[in-house]
């Protein structure tokens, strides 16, 4: 994606900026960052995920809702994956209230592993280290291949999966939301990523059709989605 963006002179990627809030007038909108820098534009699209800062200026709701689903994530060099499972496909190993998903990354050099189980033990957590012992306990009694694969990982990152209640409005003037910032959902079947891509196509369509009426374009986009 970064390489694709770099092919266009009108796309500028700015790193190490945290957006705190937004402002808008009749003719423009702006984001204000933690370091007090600001950026102006005709339109602002908040595609900043479940914990969206942009959303706070549009939707007056509470913190994300803890789902009771916990995901442990890790990667494994392909040469450590058993031959029978070195497939260039998504493979799902399903068990009672648990499942393991594996698929290749980086041109097939590594295997991504996502182990999911149900637990109400955690209230929040994102990109923190999980305990291998807990994963072993949750997956106890499952297929030997699954247990062997899990045992090969020494360090797991843990995510407490969350979502939100649906809302009818996620646009305000020249500011709108996209993807999980607008309508977060659990990660199953990559549905959140798919919805974000659909959002982007729909948004581009309406902005192209109503380039002189940004507010109308954002409302049409929201109504379609």
Please name every model-derived segment.
Residues 2-154:
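Conserved FAD-binding catalytic core of PHBH/FMO-like flavoproteins
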């Amino acid at each position: 994606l970064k390489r694709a963006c770099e092919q266009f002179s009108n796309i500028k990627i700015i790193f190490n900026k945290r957006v705190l809030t937004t402002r808008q007038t009749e003719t423009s909108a702006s984001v204000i960052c933690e370091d007090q820098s600001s950026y102006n534009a005709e339109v602002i699209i908040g595609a900043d995920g479940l914990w969206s800062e942009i959303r706070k200026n549009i939707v007056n709701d509470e913190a994300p809702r803890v789902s009771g689903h916990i995901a442990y994530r890790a990667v494994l060099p392909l040469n450590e994956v058993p031959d029978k499972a070195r497939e260039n496909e998504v493979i799902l190993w399903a068990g009672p209230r648990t499942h393991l998903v594996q698929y290749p990354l980086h041109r097939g050099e590594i295997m991504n592993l996502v182990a999911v189980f149900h637990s109400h033990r955690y209230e929040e957590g994102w990109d923190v280290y999980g305990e291998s012992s807990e994963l072993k306990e949750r997956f106890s009694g499952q297929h030997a291949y699954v247990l062997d694969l899990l045992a090969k990982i020494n360090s797991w990152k843990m995510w407490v999966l969350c979502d939100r209640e649906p809302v009818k409005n996620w646009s305000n003037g020249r500011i709108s939301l996209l993807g999980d910032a607008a309508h977060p959902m659990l990660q199953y079947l990559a549905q959140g990523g798919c919805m974000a891509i659909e959002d982007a196509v729909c948004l581009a369509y309406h902005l192209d059709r109503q380039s002189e009426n940004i507010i109308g374009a954002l409302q049409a986009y929201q109504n379609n989605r």
